[in-house]
A protein has these predicted regions:
Chain B
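Terminal low-complexity/charged segments
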Residues: 1-176
Length: 192, 176, 367
């Protein structure tokens, strides 16, 4: 890992274009196999465990946890995001392959929740990442999470979950917002 | 607790209080703190350092450092505290007495800006990353204002307007 | 770092670490030669936020400090405020609090029991552990209205009395959990892989316990009978009959045995509590909590969580807000000072079992 290696996107990637019946088939298939990157960014990850194990069993809906972002379709922002985590989350998000979807869990990514006055937790997630589905609650129950995923599946199936396209189109604007709170874009040498 | 009498005989103790049967508070001077800690560890059986904490007394211009020790045999806690000048808070490290003190001091250095001379890792970032303001746990750091300036409004302008309309409608409805 | 060594970063986005934290290690072959814990990914500044909120408004915040086991925080903070304000709480409230604490310990232990197996690649106990924990979460939901965050314990007692017939339902769940445990034992304890990997893993030198301030199951696995419930009895624990569990192996296997026996102990304690619980008031009369001022003072209260001694250092200055609240979780020492020293010389594949054995909980390290 060289010192000037690029950790983040610096130009717009090529947008994937496909249409017609292939798009329809792709969307149908994608909606039925959502792989979630296993990154518990906040306290919401405690309710993801029941969701993905025996009692609520999200695997029957085609969802499972995967370890690496390169295989994943969905990034769950589980609860509040601190500035330090936001940097990692952006990096994880940019490593994921399109099409990719973001689900925001809990009240904190919406408007800061109970950490609205905290110096280290962001207030609004949609300034920094495009969000496809919001699930409210603190914490959202597993039923609510499943309902949110159901909604995400509907959106994907009908071709309306296009947050990743928005991110590519408005990369400059998102990057400007991100740069407001992340001053140093070099990853520290203890993780990259 | 009897240990307080012995401490009073040997060291300069500026105040003490028995808070509970198993918890005593002792106040001493910065000069005597390390002898007190070593004495408590070697002779009185307070072998374990539970925590180091810092309190900001901004009005008095002081930082309070509290060293919390535990005696595993007699099951007693003792909190030894000292006051530092707030303008130039410097103190010695005690990580050679207890290894875990290193991380506690590193956290206090980051959160309050107290300097611990001789601590090898205190300048490494522990919790915050690229922090540019005054240390955040100081009383004069306004976290709400910082949050508003850095992270923006909690909701978009349209949301505030809608909320205002709703509350006005609600007020009207209540007046009826 | 020499040329033969490789720097490896475990976390924060890694399924093996216990939450959102990261460990940086240097590797020589498969062996770790140096380790450093990095935290701060979950730092929300609780202690700062509590300084600008009145006492009662801090309670929704305080339970979020440790996510899997929130009740210890509430109970500690409430007990600290009661001590400083000089409030005596009714006898029944103490017993209900003890019941809630034990239930929350039990659910955490059951999840942990599955988790330690999961860290070694056995995924069946993970499913069982989290599934069986849900029965206890259902009890919590009935009692407090929330599955994870309860905000049930408040200064002066508890928010509501037990619902009718709650005791029987608790006992029923206890019977169910007890019936399930032999199956767990069969799949975890008698598993050759678990035995081979955990026996002798992460051996802690005995002198580290007092020197570093190790507590809870980690200290008890080294043969030190440190248990806050026995040493500094709080709430209803003085009236309960139990022995401190110790093992003498100092390794991850002993920690597993200690926690396994703690499950039995928790079930036994819950039965004792329900049997001995007195009737009466559950909330002491409080002043108007919106204008509640507590005289100046400072105290340190502690209780036994699943990970060890959990302490709250509360300083008040006579106003309606706390001057300083310092939360001292056991993971702060276990996860940084101990883990950094313990990983040296271990195999890279054993990082996850060691972290789960120490039960490091990042949100309580950085608050």
């Amino acid at each position: 890992m060289g010192k000037d290696k690029k950790y983040f996107l610096d130009e717009k990637p090529e947008k994937l274009t496909y249409g017609g019946v292939f798009r329809r088939i792709n969307d149908w298939a994608r909606a039925r196999s959502l792989w979630v990157v296993a990154y518990g960014t906040g306290c919401g990850s405690i309710e993801l465990r029941p969701t993905f194990t025996s009692r609520f069993d999200a695997e029957r809906l085609g969802m499972r946890m995967v370890a690496t972002p390169r295989q994943a379709d969905v990034l769950i922002i589980s609860g509040y995001l601190t500035v330090k985590t936001l940097k990692r989350v952006i990096r994880v998000y940019e490593q994921m392959q399109s099409p990719k979807y973001v689900v925001a869990l809990g009240a904190c990514p919406i408007n800061g929740g109970m950490y609205y006055d905290s110096y280290n937790a962001i207030n609004r997630l949609d300034l920094y990442l495009p969000v496809d589905v919001w699930i409210t609650g603190c914490m959202p129950r597993p039923e609510a999470i499943l309902a949110g995923f159901k909604r995400l599946q509907e959106l994907i199936d009908s071709g309306r979950a296009d947050g990743w396209k928005k991110y590519i189109d408005n990369l400059d604007r998102y990057r400007e917002n991100q740069k407001k709170i992340i001053k140093n874009w070099k990853m520290p040498n203890y993780n990259w | 607790m009897e240990v307080l009498n012995r401490l009073r005989e040997k060291f300069e103790i500026t105040g003490d209080k028995v808070q509970r049967d198993d918890l005593a508070l002792v106040e001493t001077t910065g000069k005597d703190l390390i002898p007190v800690l070593v004495y408590l560890k070697t002779y009185e059986g307070f072998k374990t350092l539970v925590m180091i904490s810092c309190v900001d007394w901004m009005e008095k211009g002081k930082f309070q450092l509290s060293y919390n020790l535990w005696n595993p045999e007699k099951k007693k806690n003792i909190i030894v505290k000292i006051f530092l000048d707030r303008e130039n808070p410097v103190f010695q490290t005690i990580y050679k007495i207890w290894p875990q003190a290193e991380v506690y001091e590193r956290e206090i250095h980051e959160m309050f800006g107290v300097n611990f001379e001789g601590n090898p890792t205190q300048d490494e970032e522990l919790i915050l990353e690229d922090w540019e303001e005054i240390p955040p746990m100081r009383r004069d750091f306004n976290t709400l204002r910082y949050s508003m300036e850095k992270f923006g409004e909690r909701e978009p302008k349209s949301g505030i307007i809608i909320r205002k309309q709703i509350s006005e409608q609600y007020d009207e409805w209540r007046r009826k | 770092m020499s040329k033969e060594e490789v720097r490896l970063f475990i976390g924060p986005q890694h399924p093996g670490v216990t939450g959102n934290m990261s460990v940086e290690v240097l590797l020589r072959g498969d062996t770790i030669t140096w380790a450093r814990t990095h935290i701060g990914y979950l730092h929300r500044g609780f202690e700062k936020l509590m300084e600008r909120k009145i006492f009662i408004k801090s309670f929704p915040l305080v339970c979020r400090i440790c996510v899997p086991e929130p009740d210890t925080n509430e109970e500690n903070f409430a007990r600290g405020l009661e001590e400083l304000a000089g409030i005596e709480i009714p006898e029944r409230a103490k017993w209900i609090r003890t019941l809630v604490l034990e239930l929350s310990r039990l659910q955490m232990f059951i999840m942990w029991y599955g988790g330690i197996a999961g860290s070694m690649g056995l995924s069946t106990p993970v499913q069982w552990g989290i599934g069986d924990r849900d029965y206890i979460l259902d009890l919590f939901e009935e009692l407090t209205g929330g599955r994870i965050y309860h905000i049930y314990i408040m200064p002066g007692g508890v928010r509501k009395d037990l619902p009718e017939g709650f005791e029987e339902r608790v006992l029923k769940v206890m019977d169910m959990v007890e019936r399930r445990l032999p199956e767990y034992d069969e799949i975890i304890m008698e598993n050759a892989v678990v035995q081979k990997r955990l026996k002798g893993l992460a051996k802690i030198p005995k002198e580290w316990v007092d020197e570093m301030g190790l507590t809870g199951p980690v200290a008890r696995a080294c043969g030190f009978p440190y248990d806050v419930r026995k040493d500094h009895p709080y709430e209803a624990y003085p009236h309960l009959d139990f022995d401190v569990i110790t093992e003498d192996g100092c390794d991850a296997w002993s920690m597993l045995l200690v926690r396994r026996r703690e499950i039995d102990l928790s079930i036994d304690l819950i039965r004792q509590i329900i049997e001995k619980m007195p009737r009466g008031e559950f909330l002491a009369p409080l002043p108007n909590v919106l204008y509640w001022k507590i005289p100046p003072g400072e105290t340190y209260v502690k209780s036994e969580s699943t990970r060890g001694e959990y302490g709250f250092y509360v300083v008040t200055d006579g106003s309606d807000k706390p001057r300083r609240v310092h939360v001292n979780g056991p993971s702060f020492v276990h996860g940084i000072t101990l883990l950094e020293r313990l990983l040296v010389g271990q195999n890279i594949a054993d990082v996850a079992p060691i972290m789960v054995s120490l039960q490091t909980c990042p949100p309580e390290m950085e608050r």
